Amino acid sequence: MLNSTYRIILAGFFCSWCLSSIAQSLPPYNPVTDERLQNPEESNWLMYRGSYDSHGYSTLDEINIENVEDLVPVWSFSTGLREGHQAPPIVNDGYMYVSTPQNHIIAIDARTGDMIWRYVRFLPDDLQQMHPTNRGVALYGDRVYLATVDAYLVSLDALTGDVIWEVEVEDYYNGYYMTMAPLIADGKVMVGVSGGELGIRGFVAAFDVMTGEPAWKTYTIPAPGEPGSESWPGDTWQTGGVPVWLTGSYDPEFNVAYWGTGNGGPWMGDTRPGDNLYATSTIALDASTGELKAHHQYHWNDSWDWDEVSAPLLIDYQRQGETVKGMVHPGRNGYLWFLEREENQINFVDANPYVYQDVFTTLDPVTGRPEYDMSKKPGTGFEASFCPSLWGGKDWPPAAFNPVSRLLFIPANDNVCSTMEGEEVQFRPGRPFMGRAPSENGGFFVRPGTNHIGELQAWNVDTGEKAWTTSFASQNWGPVLATAGDLVFMGGTNDRYFRAFDANNGEILWQQRTNSGITGVPVTYSLDGKQYIAVQSGWGVDAQREQNLLNLVKGENHYVPQGGVIWVFALPD
């Protein structure tokens, strides 16, 4: 195992040999400030979803429905790595930063595709983690921040890639790892942990953005005596999972960060009777102190592996002639949730299924708490089939929102279901702690009589009604980008296409086949008045796992090549 000091020395060595004269041709680096994060320029993409509200929307419109058919690749860059490339390219005035599987960061001239530097992290041989990916970096001042799969937070010099500091967030040996892009606000860099299948106790932690000193740590499972602890019997709270593995949203007015939380552990709810707060919830944390201000639990005593880790989109919408200061969450459980956010409270407004869902029978009209068809709830020694599958109506790929058209765009999967049965499992630190019995074809099946799986859906947030759906035979693992050019960009299908859709009706206006399937988050930026679209291709992780199961179920042998490439597109000069 490499110690921290050796890691820093080696990483610095690799940065120094690849540092080139490219940086000399770029403008001086523009430090990222609180003001720039709260009011991001349309020419840049400074954070995971482009803005604190997680809209995934850009006001750039040079590329639009009238000319997108002319879009062409202007440069590409091979990462040299396999597995799932899921991170967005983060762009600051010509400097692009892309993270990859195995915790590399590549700094690139966003005009030309020339590499400026590369950070290589050397990971310990005994690392146990379920998802060898990374979902992006964060920027602040003249630094780049990375959350690593060996559970460290690293601060690097944005111009050279030299490590400034790194801190251990938790001990990876106990099953903790990180895949999310950090969230920076209120002078803190905030991260959450993965490991819900490895017997962890989830949390969100904050560190001083300049020094790395710990600021606060808030667990997602309350300890005995804390509010909500009664929902965890005995010692189950110590190993109950509830990870936080996607970047949160942030409301500067309330100084509150909103985070999604994952499944309880083991998977079968009968091993931990109770609601299991704050699993499968949105939690509101004070960015200064970490205090839990409010929560909404989407479903209780999860037994389906339906993580609800996607951060809610902060959207103010109309209901009954009134404006709701709202949050919208397309749930993994297959329901589209509309909530209201107050400074110290989250209120349920309404929710409806956006894919076929056969577990919930009713929702409480005041709280949104679902009741279940218990024949659809697997348990220890009890097999149950349910829809949607364990990957849900939408897994981690983020939705996007156009505030002008009022349309929310959801990358959905319909008509796929799971069969699961639980078995007893013994806890061992850092080892799988799921308690799921083996099953034929992984317990995966497609609903009879259906002809597609993947979808791109558009919903009007003010009416709560679906506007249109575009369907694909393939599953869909494509994050979504929306632009003022009335366009939606998405990859995600197993045919390796990256597509542009008419945001008004879902018509495919342009498509480009790439080297691999696209599970990266697309972004847009502009330089010298010219708009670019950027995305990473690179199939792997759960998209490939689901493909393997579909091949078994359908009797097919559909092969999706792996290999990461950063693609950048623009209109011809």
Place the predicted regions along the sequence by residue.
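Short loop/turn segments that connect beta-strands within beta-propeller blades
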Residues: 109-112, 157-160, 209-211, 287-289, ...
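Blade/loop signatures of beta-propeller domains
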Residues: 24-73, 220-227, 370-376, 445-446, ...
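Extracytoplasmic beta-rich repeat domains
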Residues: 77-90, 118-138, 166-181, 198, ...
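N-terminal cofactor/phosphate-binding cores enriched in small/glycine residues
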Residues: 54-170, 482-483
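Blade-level signature of beta-propeller repeat domains, shared across WD40, Kelch, NHL, RCC1
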Residues: 523-573
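Loop/turn-rich, solvent-exposed surfaces of beta-rich toroidal or solenoidal domains
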Residues: 414, 442, 448-507
